[in-house]
Amino acid sequence: MMVQSIQIVLPVALFFLIVFNGFTVEGSKKEAQLYRDLLTNYSYLVRPVRNPKKALTVTMKVFIQQVLLVDAKHQMIEVNAWLKYIWTDFRLRWNPLDYENITSVRFQGEDQIWQPDILLYNRYIEDEQESFDITYKTNAVAYSDGVINWIPPGIFKLSCKMDITLFPFDEQICFMKFGSWTYHGFALDLRLDVVKGQEPSADLSTYITNGEWHLLSAPARREEKFYKCCKEPYPTVKFYLHLRRRTFYYVFNVVLPTLLVSFMSLLAFCLPATDLSEKIGLQTTILLSVCFFLTILSEMTPTTSEAVPLLGVFFSALTFIVAMSTTFTILVLNIRYRQITNHYLSPMFRSIFLECLPWLMMMKRPDHKFRRGSSYRDSSADQCVQCAKNAELKSILRGTDNQQQIETNTFYPFPTETLSLNRKVGDGLFIQRRCQIHEEARSEKFTHGMLACEKSLRENGSELANILVTILKMYEVMVSQVERIRKRIALKRKRKDIQDEWKFAAQAVDRFCLIIFTIVFIICCFIFVAIPPIKILD
């Protein structure tokens, strides 16, 4: 049963195979006959025009597929695009009815039919061995009415003059310039393929977006150029590429880290002036970080002196700010660690850094109030200093004779003085200069008084007077020792107070630098954001 079925199916299959093969051979014969008829006496070197004095019209359109690369450093753009050329060849017309309704045929390149020698004028060539024409040689489609449609694809590398002034918020406008290499405008009229009612432009219907650039538009324009040597026009077609850089990558990976690092330089002024190594180490590390980002930026931008990118100017400004902040930090530490033994606190320095600057910076100190151009100590916290009190030396020993009393005032009147003092910063924030002067005057007067009293007692010559002289000598020794201790304590207090004044001056300069550099930093950031004509984030 199986054998009988095979014997029936095989003849039927063989019959249909022979019939369809005959149709195919007949169709191929018609197409081959059409090729022979069209190419008989055809020369691909001759322009397809009946009148040699008339120009052949060639329309052109570009289909942008993708922007592959925008290399600002080498001033080059790489684009994947299709080119579409349409022209009419009167020698390639036929009646489809004579050739089994064949309406179109394909010709392989310029070796069979005439093709326009249109090239990309602004072609970018990296290697000397590269061909100037980089389009893929596809077949040209010829229709029965003589219309030729040729669509060669290619990856085009074109030179583009880029302006990186607003980098990374820049927009670039590049163009693809096409034109005939040998034909002038009277022989080949190159025109744009424009849809009626629309502006001439490249086709973006199949465009694939780029991760770094926005393709905003691709307008087209036809131009004619005349040269001094010739009267014929030379038409060209330009397809512009209006590109805008996507800024999120640069803002997130370059700008924001640099801003944060630079902002940390302001925090160095908030560190105590006693942290010598920490302040200098922090400022130096920040300076190196900004220089590192500046090195990364230099690798992104072209090596040109025509324009400096905005981001480069911003980084340079930040580098300058950090460098100056480091310098002023060193100045603050220099003021902080000055001593009375090697530096003199001049009146002008006092007036500027201990009076005016703290008042401007609205600084506060315990027991002191700052006013414009001066500083004084709060009187509620001061105590009246009494430099001397009334002293009387009365009778120490009383004899049996109650009429005999010795009063010190009979020997010598001791000086008495009362002084109320309001200390001023101009006389020293922490040094009781006036009190010290009055204490020294009081001590000198008291010494003279004791000497005069001793002299009077010696002249008296009584036993009681001799005892009193001995007591006065012992008291004089104690007074001299106490005076020596007082002077030593006063010297230590003086040194400490002057050192505290240097510390306070360093704090005032530190506060001043913090405010100034903060203002400069904010201004730089505002200018960086305000100058670009586009938004920071897309």
Swiss-Prot record:
Q: Where are the transmembrane segments?
A: 251-271, 280-300, 313-333, 514-534
Is Ligase there in the keyword field? no
Cytoplasmic compartment segments: 334-513
GO terms under cellular component = acetylcholine-gated channel complex; neuron projection; plasma membrane; postsynaptic membrane; synapse
**Keywords in alphabetical order:** Cell membrane, Disulfide bond, Glycoprotein, Ion channel, Ion transport, Ligand-gated ion channel, Membrane, Postsynaptic cell membrane, Receptor, Signal, Synapse, Transmembrane, Transmembrane helix, Transport
Q: List all topological domains (Extracellular).
A: 28-250
Give the bilayer topology.
Multi-pass membrane protein
Please name the SUPFAM superfamilies in this protein's record: Neurotransmitter-gated ion-channel transmembrane pore, Nicotinic receptor ligand binding domain-like
**A family per Pfam:** Neur_chan_LBD
Major location (coarse): membrane
Q: What does this protein do?
A: After binding acetylcholine, the AChR responds by an extensive change in conformation that affects all subunits and leads to opening of an ion-conducting channel across the plasma membrane.
Mind telling me what this protein is named?
Answer: Acetylcholine receptor subunit alpha-type acr-7
